[in-house]
A protein has these predicted regions:
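Metal-cofactor-binding active-site regions of metalloenzymes
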Residues: 2-236
Length: 245
């Protein structure tokens, strides 16, 4: 016997902050919705000149991605128009112009979304929590991603004691004073989830950072990240908040 879950409220537990971008062109909308559709900035960095022909090919590629096609189809159904980009964009821009927060409220209502666990670690520079809460009419639960902090600390000319202190203090401040209600790591995307319980020892953090500073390699970056994930879990336990991995 099947169970109909269509009417159940939904909490989105993996999302990122977004603000009102106002009216969008077709190319703007395509870039925003073609997840995995290649960023223009990547090509020159790889030695590919952004000619008109390359831009046209990119546009076709992006509009053929599953995410873009699904977004156009879903918004077409929402607005009651044909699944055509121009028709959808015309109605979307009109809805945003009439009131962005009301438009988002209607979208969330249609999807049954009643709350969002929001990872503020992307995009960078980080968006503040307050404007998101002002524009997005649902419960926002912010979580603090540790990877931007790790990048910042690695760029600082500091030893292990100061590194560890700043890491702990920044996370504690985020949880006690800045409105964050959990911590997140994307270590699975970085060095993987094969983390030994022994990684929690401070000696591993010290030795790993020292090896990184001296350019010794030997898996030192993984060892440092493994230790900091373990330390983050300890901080979450101290503050009685969850950690998302």
């Amino acid at each position: 016997m099947g169970i109909d879950v269509a009417g159940l409220p939904v909490i989105d537990v993996h999302c990122h902050p977004f603000l009102d971008r106002g009216e969008l062109t077709a190319d703007d909308f395509t870039r925003l919705t073609a997840f995995g559709g290649v960023d223009d900035d990547w090509l020159p960095a790889g030695g590919v000149e952004l000619t008109d022909a390359v831009r046209d090919e990119l546009r076709r590629f992006r509009r053929d991605t599953a995410y873009h096609k699904r977004m156009v189809a879903d918004l077409a159904a929402f607005f009651g128009v044909e699944p055509d980009l121009d028709a959808v964009l015309e109605r979307r821009n009109a809805a945003v112009g009439a009131g962005y927060s009301d438009y988002v409220r209607r979208l969330f209502g249609d999807a049954g979304i009643t709350g969002a666990v929001v990872d503020f670690g992307y995009p960078q520079p980080a968006i503040e929590i307050k404007p998101i809460r002002a524009q997005i009419p649902t419960e926002i639960v912010p979580i603090y991603r540790i990877e931007p902090l790790i990048v910042e600390l690695l760029a600082s000319d500091i030893g292990w004691d100061e590194f560890r202190r700043r890491f702990d203090d920044t996370i504690a401040n985020a949880l006690t004073n800045r409105g964050y209600r959990g911590v997140k790591s994307i270590i699975a995307y970085r060095t993987g989830l094969d983390i030994s319980p022994l990684s929690r020892t401070p000696d591993q953090g010290y030795l790993a950072l020292d090896a990184i500073r001296r350019g010794l390699g030997g898996g030192s970056m993984k060892k440092l990240r493994d230790h900091l994930v373990c330390r983050s879990l300890e901080l979450c336990m101290e503050h009685s908040v969850p950690m998302q991995i």
